[in-house]
A protein has these predicted regions:
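Cytosolic covalent-transfer regions centered on His/Cys nucleophiles
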Residues: 1-196
Length: 196
């Protein structure tokens, strides 16, 4: 197995010059990296991309009353952390990026997508969403009341769900229904297009 041999070669070099705290995690990370570089993405090898309903499962959609954006992002990440879908460092990286890089992450009026790199502690592609009663300042450069947390294991797996989300929030009436939803279940139903 060519890729396995490459991973072993990289492991040998790294271990010569660095103290490796967790060999198994390093091996997994190198395997993912090498696989991604060698991947040609043939359709047969690509499992179907999850849609929005697959990722925004019950318990991943919340209504909250917080005024601090870091608290809102942390709240959104909580179910993902509790299920082991992301690691704590993914949450910290999202917050640090907003603080330091001030990325433009707004996709519609008052709607932001908080995310970090695929190698920043993602175990499984996942999403969660927090809706606030009114817009709050996101590090004093954006205003948002809807925060989508996105984590993806590669550059493709989240695209279908993200496209569906963008469709929902890009139309004013869809956005209004998201803001009017009375509870988390109703909000999820609006988001995934299953409202009664």
């Amino acid at each position: 197995n060519l890729q396995g041999n490459e991973v072993d070669d990289y492991m040998d070099v790294i271990e010569q010059y660095a103290k490796v705290e967790n060999k198994e995690e390093l091996r997994k990370g190198l395997s993912r990296l090498l696989y991604r570089q060698n991947e040609k993405l043939p359709a047969a090898k690509n499992p179907a991309q999850p849609d929005l309903a697959d990722l925004l499962v019950p318990g991943h959609v919340m209504l909250a009353e917080v005024t601090d954006w870091k608290e809102a992002v942390s709240l959104g990440a909580r179910p993902l952390l509790e299920k082991g879908l992301i690691q704590e460092r993914y949450l910290q990286t999202m917050i640090r990026q907003i603080l330091i890089q001030r990325p433009y992450i707004m996709v519609a009026d008052g709607v932001i997508i908080a995310h970090a790199a695929i190698d920043a502690g993602v175990n499984e592609t996942c999403m969660s969403l927090v809706r606030l009663p009114h817009k709050i300042a996101i590090h004093d450069y954006l205003q948002a009341d809807i925060i989508l947390i996105l984590a993806t294991v590669d550059f493709q797996n989240h695209l279908k769900a993200l496209s569906q989300f963008n469709e929902r929030v890009s139309e004013p009436e869809g956005l209004a229904r998201i803001r009017r939803a009375a509870d988390a279940d109703a909000l999820r139903a609006v988001l995934i297009g299953k409202e009664g």
